[in-house]
Amino acid sequence: MAKRVAIVGAGVSGLASIKCCLEEGLEPTCFERSDDLGGLWRFTEHVEEGRASLYKSVVSNSCKEMSCYSDFPFPEDYPNYVPNSQFLDYLKMYADRFSLLKSIQFKTTVFSITKCQDFNVSGQWEVVTLHEGKQESAIFDAVMVCTGFLTNPHLPLGCFPGIKTFKGQYFHSRQYKHPDIFKDKRVLVVGMGNSGTDIAVEASHVAKKVFLSTTGGAWVISRVFDSGYPWDMVFTTRFQNFIRNSLPTPIVTWLVAKKMNSWFNHANYGLVPKDRIQLKEPVLNDELPGRIITGKVFIRPSIKEVKENSVVFGNAHNTPSEEPIDVIVFATGYTFAFPFLDESVVKVEDGQASLYKYIFPAHLQKPTLAVIGLIKPLGSMLPTGETQARYTVQVFKGVIKLPPTSVMIKEVNERKENKHNGFGLCYCKALQADYITYIDDLLTSINAKPNLFSLLLTDPLLALTMFFGPYSPYQFRLTGPGKWKGARNAIMTQWDRTFKVTKTRIVQESSSPFESLLKLFAVLALLVSVFLIFL
């Protein structure tokens, strides 16, 4: 009899979890509280409780070749960075292609998930759900929690003295949908993550004046990177990751700063991150520098005090310390919680949960509950969650045996202590992980990591493409369980799909003898690098 698996949420990770269960002979039942799949990527005009909320203009921050499911590329005619409506269409195509809808119960809220009385023996869970006013209970052999971490807004009003006296409008960025509400208003956006920056830029097209308040600053990069390539196809490669992790942290930090400043000097715009040693995810925005230099967005430091109709900033430089404000948007992030789980199952402290490999509660007697997608890699979340799901089902099936509880708890505690070995980038913030290192570790565990040295002997072109080219998800399907016969072709044609939607006019490309000579030297240097790295 197939093991029954309860899956909470039908977003990108939930859909991947359903597919992984079906592929491995498990029996999944996915509970989705709304009336459709898609999670974060399904736009609605109104905020829905318990669901991530996005604004109308959201576009993916990771390009289509890097943010697809590993055995299901985006359609070739999709833009490289996908608008939310098309991303949702893609998820629906995925669900149709692999017959996932039959495993989803829509309009069903998970009320509670508790251990069965014989949990220490069976590892089973009782799942209580609510559907159209009717409460139901069922027993499952395992549970996969795929609710994400963008549903509970973090709004620390106590950190902003005087906010209760403010006569204007203020709200969390989760409530934002369209820029029309800012027309002819003086707007302050607090927080410089991707959402805060997007909102400030959008508001600047209709508002009277826009201020963006940041305490720690941030690196800002464009989706359009070196030579017009998508940023993550250039930045996220095995070769670059090898170089970054082999150098002392101060050198890596300097190199990263140099690269980030190649678009514009962040110091001249008041944006340089306060802490450059601990890696902070860069902000993706194609317009911000242009809006700042044309006087449409003004960067300000942290808020000192909020008055009835104005805001006072601390340590303002070359500018008034007080500005009249009509609307304040708090883009202050999110907290995460699992209201349907007892704290003894997954305890959240200081923005972290004690999860082995960011998946399994380290203290559970039986590894039958997994949290999928509760991680912040410097890479796409979709293939990360999918790889976590592939790993998880192998644990559920007993193919992978987790280490003793003491070993898992020790690893989790070491991660929480923010220890750093002095080499490579410093991933010391809660939930942060090195994207390539993390996924390679999971792939190794399920025997799905490609052996580049063997490939160098049998298929050298593929090996070199994988090492020096983008770390695209298709690499995760070359071997092991879930192997996809189209993986090699997808890897070798990824640049063709990238340029198909941009090369819409025939142009004459000519190269000088000097350029040809440079390319020859580049090839020779590449071969020497391969020899040194692999031997």
UniProtKB/Swiss-Prot annotation:
Protein name from the UniProt record: Flavin-containing monooxygenase 1
Gene that encodes the chain: FMO1
Pfam families found in the cross-reference section: FMO-like
Species this protein is from: Oryctolagus cuniculus
Binding site for FAD: 9-13, 32, 40-41, 61-62
Group of enzyme by EC: oxidoreductase
Transmembrane segments: 514-534
Catalytic activity: hypotaurine + NADPH + O2 + H(+) = taurine + NADP(+) + H2O; hypotaurine + NADH + O2 + H(+) = taurine + NAD(+) + H2O; trimethylamine + NADPH + O2 = trimethylamine N-oxide + NADP(+) + H2O; N,N-dimethylaniline + NADPH + O2 + H(+) = N,N-dimethylaniline N-oxide + NADP(+) + H2O
Family stated for the protein in its record: Belongs to the FMO family.
Compartments it resides in: Endoplasmic reticulum membrane
